[in-house]
Amino acid sequence: MASTADFKNGLVLQIDGQLWQIVEFQHVKPGKGPAFVRTKLKNVVSGKVVDKTYNAGVKVETATVDRRDATYLYRDGSDFVFMDSEDFEQHPLPEALVGRLAGFLLESMPVQIAFHDGVPLYLELPVTVELLVAHTEPGLQGDRSSAGTKPATMETGAEIQVPLFINTGDKLKVDSRDGSYLGRVNA
C-alpha cells in the first residue's frame, strides 16, 4: 500500500486486478476544497492510457515489480532474446511486448526488464540511444522559409524526423521514449 504522497513516475499500481503504471502525476491544491492528485496511468498489459484523480492521502495498492538488468542478444522469429545480467538466464520476449521499442534495439544494448510474479511486463531502454542513419534523402536548404525536417531510416529500421543537414551514414543520438532527434554524435 502506498499513499498519494508516495506517487512517482514508473510506480506500478494494482487497480481492480490489473496493473497500471504512473506515466505522470500532478499534486493539486486548489484555493477552495481539499488537495488531490491528478494522474495519467498506463495499463501495463494493453498499453491503454487513462486519467484518474485521487484525493490527497488516499492509500492505493501497489504491485511488486522486479526490475532486472539485461542485455539484448538477438531476434529469433517474432521473439527478442535478452540475457539476464545477474544469472545469465535468457528471456525471450514476444514482439507484442517489445512494441515500438524494437526500432531502437541494438545487439549488446543494456536494458531493464520489469517482472511481476516471474512474468515479464515491459521493457525499458536507455533514454538516449546512438544509431546510424541507413538512408535519408539529401536536404535542399533553400526551399523553405524556416528550419525543416525530413524522414530518415535508422540502422534498426526505425524512421525518425531529422534536420535537413543530416546525411546517410551519420551517427545520431535519439530519444528512445518518443523517437525524437537529439543531435549528432561526434566521431
Swiss-Prot record:
Q: Which domain of life is it from?
A: Bacteria
The keyword Protein biosynthesis is annotated on this UniProt entry? yes
Please tell me where this protein is predominantly located: cytoplasm
Q: Which GO terms describe its biological process?
A: peptide biosynthetic process
Pathway note: Protein biosynthesis; polypeptide chain elongation
Question: Can you supply one Gene Ontology CC term for this chain's record?
Answer: cytoplasm
**Pfam families attached here?**
EFP, EFP_N, Elong-fact-P_C
Query: Where found in the cell?
Result: Cytoplasm
User: Keywords for this entry?
Assistant: Cytoplasm, Elongation factor, Protein biosynthesis
Q: Where are the transmembrane segments?
A: none
Is Cytoplasm there in the keyword field? yes
Gene Ontology MF: a single term: translation elongation factor activity
| UniProt similarity note | Belongs to the elongation factor P family.
What is the documented function of this protein? Involved in peptide bond synthesis. Stimulates efficient translation and peptide-bond synthesis on native or reconstituted 70S ribosomes in vitro. Probably functions indirectly by altering the affinity of the ribosome for aminoacyl-tRNA, thus increasing their reactivity as acceptors for peptidyl transferase.
Protein's UniProt name: Elongation factor P
- Origin organism of this chain? Mycolicibacterium gilvum (strain PYR-GCK) (Mycobacterium gilvum (strain PYR-GCK))
